[in-house]
A protein has these predicted regions:
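Polytopic transmembrane helical bundles with strong interfacial aromatic enrichment
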Residues: 8-11, 69, 77
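Interhelical loop and helix-boundary elements at the membrane-water interface
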Residues: 9-22, 85-94, 132-150
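Short hydrophobic alpha-helical membrane-embedded segments
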Residues: 23-26, 93-103, 121-124, 145-150
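Membrane-embedded alpha-helical segments that form the functional core of polytopic membrane enzymes
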Residues: 28-36, 40-72, 80, 104, ...
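Membrane-interface helix caps and helix-loop-helix hairpins in membrane proteins
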Residues: 112-117, 134-142, 161-167
Length: 170
């Protein structure tokens, strides 16, 4: 018996570990903040928007991957989550951490290339989601309140990427 992994299964597990559908919807929130914050579109604006979209996807995907490592044992017990790559054993936790770390680095580099504040918001979002919200989910319903903060950051990230500043408008 050979243990082969197809490119399709790697792709599908990558989509699952990053929660691609959720990540893309969060990216749209960043794009909305960017569009509302930008004064006018130029050719260079599209380049910034592309870096925001890819960097934002990386940050959300990294958060989701870290989350699945942290919650692997709990995920394995629930019907809704037991088939996730780490919980099911298709992906080793260390592989998921490497994927999440690479996404974090790429996301931070892309966001920093827009402006340092964008990278800061990306880093804060990952920290709040993985280090505060995820552990609180099993302890208190107040985790929903805490989760609202990383949930609001993508729009602010888009605004900061467009304007270079964080103000009351965001």
């Amino acid at each position: 018996m050979t243990n082969t992994v197809s490119l399709k299964s790697i792709y599908l597990d990558f989509k699952a570990i990053t929660k691609a559908g959720l990540a893309i919807s969060v990216v749209f929130s960043s794009i909305a903040g960017f569009v509302l914050g930008i004064d006018h579109f130029e050719v260079s604006t599209w380049w910034v928007l592309l870096k925001l979209a890819i960097g934002g996807y990386c940050m959300v995907g990294a958060s989701n991957a870290y989350n699945q490592v942290i919650e692997k044992d709990l995920d394995a017990l629930m019907d809704r989550t037991k088939n996730r790559p780490v919980a099911s054993g298709r992906m080793q936790p260390r592989v998921a951490v490497v994927v999440a770390s690479m996404l974090t680095i790429l996301g931070l580099v892309l966001l920093y290339s827009i402006n340092p504040s964008s990278a800061m918001f990306g880093a804060i979002s990952i920290f709040l989601y993985t280090s505060v919200y995820t552990p609180l989910k099993t302890m208190t319903s107040l985790s929903v309140f805490v989760g609202a903060f990383p949930g609001a950051i993508p729009f602010m990230l888009g605004w900061v990427a467009a304007t270079g500043e964080f103000g009351i408008e965001a």
